[in-house]
Amino acid sequence: MPENSKSGGINIYRYNAEKERLDLVHEVGHLPLTDATIVKFHSDEEFVFSTKLPNPNGNEWEIYPFDGKFMKMEAKALDTVSFPSNIARNAGDSFYIGEQMYRPAQDCNKCYGNGINIQQVNSVGGKFELKTVNEFHSDNPDYGLGYHTFNIKNGLIVVDGHRYRFPRIVKLLHILSKLK
């Protein structure tokens, strides 16, 4: 599902190879969700994990029931997890190691995607519990703004860092702004 929070809804598209475009299939749900992911939890229940506007980089993570057969989600959150800091926003798809689900989350305490937290996901009595088991931040000066995506699939890990495209110009503008 592409990021589409500003439109107020999430849509599913199908790639049209003949016309080389994405065709709208239907709206999954009408909520301003950010970096929403569809996950199959241990019991084969499906959920949408997400944060939402107006505080996408905050500390509240929501879980919505999802019907994979009809590709629709419920508008009312099943559960909300509140974190002590701004680490709620998804940073990619959840994944399993053995029977244990993990979720990559963005550390948004300094800025959007400052780093990645890997969180263990459990459900106890119908309530979701998350525990950070690892975190990492960029030590590469070329990607000093951080990491905002972590995906793992078929033995490959993809991490997306972000940076200023023209760091020298940004540094010069920063110096000039202090001269006022």
Name what the model sees in each region:
Residues 1-180:
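Carbohydrate-active catalytic/glycan-binding domains of CAZyme proteins
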